[in-house]
């Protein structure tokens, strides 16, 4: 087993591990004590991977170039773009593009929607016309109603005509019906005397028969 020539350690000594890494910087930076494990490190290359958590800051030249690009807008005209926010706002305030009209059933989608709207309006107009008939239809309905009313009143007219003829035959006094005189009155029936009713009942073959006899008494 080989030993380290500096610390007399085994092959797993930090010096052997350091030797396996390539050395890119031959300058000797000041010793930095990151941990007790690296107290033998002189050049500090073994702990270089610990400094990778914080990336290096940009160089002044790159920073100046980036600032110049932001100031000049990448055109190198030497002027500031003061109206750039206004242009961005105008871009945001632009109207959206109109919807794309796609073909649909032999025509455009807009034409199809227009036809459907027209058909709906026509249907509503037909329904309104059905509820509100025209003048000719109204006249025809009125004539049918009058004819039906005449036929319904035909019997009443006959009855009224007969009553009218009978009223014309009756005598009138100053437009009013006059009483019929006694000579024209029909003769009254003769007066009759008292009557007596005699009832007799008898039984025949188990049936009771009641016989009633009326006799007029002399006055």
Curated annotation (Swiss-Prot):
SS bond partners: none
Purpose: Involved in the regulation of vernalization; this process in essential for flowering in cv. Bd29-1 but seems do not occur in cv. Bd21.
Signal peptide: none
Induction field: Accumulates in leaves but not in shoot apical meristem (SAM) meristem during vernalization in cv. Bd29-1, but expression is independent of vernalization in cv. Bd21.
PANTHER family assigned: TRANSCRIPTION FACTOR GHD7 (PTHR31319:SF98), ZINC FINGER PROTEIN CONSTANS-LIKE 4 (PTHR31319)
Tissues in which the protein is found: Mainly expressed in leaves, and at low levels in the shoot apical meristem (SAM).
Protein species of origin: Brachypodium distachyon (Purple false brome)
Protein name: Protein VERNALIZATION 2
The entry's keywords: Nucleus
Organism lineage: Eukaryota, Viridiplantae, Streptophyta, Embryophyta, Tracheophyta
Cellular compartments annotated: Nucleus
